[in-house]
């Protein structure tokens, strides 16, 4: 799905920078002090610059235990430090430093997407949207949820075509 989206976006003339979090080796944040004042690990400097540069972000991940994989969450915690995603304001709400950007969240899962939305309330995706992306000023945020259970080849081909269309539109 990531290939379908990024290849179509590049073919449509968009400048695509891919960050494959699973290929990165970085330490997890362990204290509030590390989050607030610690240095960004060297291996995350370029990915962080790529995020700051991009006007549209696409996050694609598998659903693990109802939410994003821990490594992806650890990456976001490192990247979304004060001064990158928001700036604290002692007199009110933090200043949103990522305003003007948009995002698409693409999630694959081993259950029907309708069940994740209806029964589980899509809490992992909603939490990501509200507590990180929206809070930092990113909007609009669109989501695409794909339940791989019972998906035949025809349905999977439609999903890849959908990703290509999103890529072509830069959506």
Question: Positions of the model-derived regions?
Answer:
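Anion (oxyanion) recognition and catalysis
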Residues: 10, 52, 134
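Helix-loop-strand module that forms the ligand-binding subsite of alpha/beta enzymes
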Residues: 39-129
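Generic structural signal for helix capping and beta-alpha/helix-loop junctions
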Residues: 25-26, 68, 113, 150
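Glycine-rich phosphate/pyrophosphate-binding loop and the adjoining helix
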Residues: 118-171
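N-terminal beta-loop-helix "entrance" segment that forms/cooperates
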Residues: 18-40, 156
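N-terminal beta1-alpha1 ligand-phosphate binding loop
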Residues: 1-14, 19
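Hydrophobic/aromatic beta-strand patches that form the interior of the parallel beta-sheet core
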Residues: 17-19, 58, 104-107, 141-144
């Amino acid at each position: 799905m990531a290939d379908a989206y990024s290849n179509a976006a590049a073919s449509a003339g968009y400048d695509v920078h891919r960050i494959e979090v699973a290929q990165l080796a970085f330490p997890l944040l362990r204290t509030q002090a590390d989050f607030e004042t610690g240095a960004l690990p060297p291996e995350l400097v370029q990915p962080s610059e790529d995020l700051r540069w991009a006007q549209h972000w696409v996050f694609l991940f598998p659903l693990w235990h109802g939410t994003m994989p821990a490594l992806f969450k650890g990456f976001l915690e490192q990247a979304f430090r004060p001064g990158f995603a928001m700036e604290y304001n002692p007199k009110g709400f933090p200043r949103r430093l990522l305003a003007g950007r948009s995002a698409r969240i693409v999630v694959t899962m081993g259950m029907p997407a309708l069940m994740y939305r209806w029964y589980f309330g899509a809490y992992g995706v909603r939490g990501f949207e509200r507590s990180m992306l929206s809070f930092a000023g990113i909007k609009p945020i669109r989501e695409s949820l794909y339940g791989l259970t019972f998906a035949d080849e025809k349905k999977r081909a439609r999903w890849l075509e959908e990703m290509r269309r999103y890529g072509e539109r830069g959506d």
